[in-house]
Amino acid sequence: MSGFIYLASQSPRRRQLLEQIGVCHELLLPGADEDAEALEAVVAGELPEAYCARVTAAKLDAALARRAARGLPPAPILCADTTVALGDTILAKPSDEADAERMLRALSGQTHRVLTAVCVHGQLRLSTSHVQWRVLDDGEITRYVASREPFGKAGAYAIQGRSGAWTQHIDGSYSGIMGLPLFETTELLKPLGWQV
């Protein structure tokens, strides 16, 4: 077992969650020549679960190539992807203010799914959580979008931020909703000798 893992993610929440469970990690971030966002393009007709697993596997392939190209020492690589789904509709990261407002209006008063796939050493686990929101008024949506918090986040929100006040009920993994399901992550790390 190496003394660390590579985290192939730009998410500060994933770093925080790994630190919370005491996993030493080094970042393995995309270079300027990589189009990381292109990996997250939705394929027409793709279901949310298949999308989330495919994107996570693609991120792992890119991270393996990156590690090899940079001549880095061997260590397990952790990749993850979080997807918000309303029915079979994938709500990706908002492209602009109007897109964020559209997503938040769609989620208002609804129960939606948050899927996070995590992959370590070629093994993938999927966490599915159900999140119920109260009805939002136009002012709340406008203020939230103006806060800039929705950007860079699937479904245009961060459960650990201001939108947590709209959450009536969660059935599933809070850490999974944040971006890294700790149960599934530790189950993937145990066979590699990690003890949490």
PLM feature spans:
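Anionic-ligand binding patches
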Residues: S2-I5, V42-V196
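N-terminal beta1-alpha1 ligand-phosphate binding loop
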Residues: S2-V23
